[in-house]
Amino acid sequence: MTVNYTERYAVHPDDYEMYNSAMLRENFHVGGLFVADEVNLVYTQIDRFIVGGACPADTPLKLDTIDALKAVHFLDRRELGAVNVGGAGRITVDGETYDIAYKEALYVGAGAKEVVFESVDAANPAKFYLNSATAHHSYPNKKVGLDDAIK
């Protein structure tokens, strides 16, 4: 399984004032994140932030590193937040499995070697919205369930 990614670059404020709708969409809209059985990422040159989606339907999806990171593992120097916006799913981090229901999230600390996304039901796949940023310290993984949310 390959992780698909594109790169985005910073835009000078004087430049984007001249953009038409098509150019604004091309430079700022992030679409196509939730394609069945794919991990799709957008790596931005703005603080090296990554936004993405993982939609495991028929097969588990491993979060492999991408060339832009120049790292052996995706989370060697990064942390990850994954929010499930689809059907029930699971995320396995270095052998520990977390059940992640709709609207629940998992924080994965820097240094994790293997992250795998799965769906409970292929007919109603999990859709994990991903955010990743550089990290200079590793914190423990933490599931944030609906009961943990401030209401």
Regions found by a protein language model. Name each.
Residues 1-71, 75-78, 135:
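Transition-metal
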Residues 52, 84, 131:
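Short beta-strand segments
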Residues 62-64, 99-103, 142-144:
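Short amphipathic beta-strand/extended segments with alternating polar/hydrophobic composition
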Residues 74-90:
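Short, conserved beta-strand element in jelly-roll/cupin
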Residues 91-93, 117:
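Short hydrophobic/aromatic-rich beta-strand segments that constitute the beta-sheet cores
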Residues 93-110:
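Short acidic-glycine-tyrosine-enriched beta hairpin
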Residues 112-115:
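Short, charged beta-turn/beta-strand-edge "cap" motif at the junction between a beta-strand
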Residues 117-151:
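Surface-exposed beta-loop interaction hotspot
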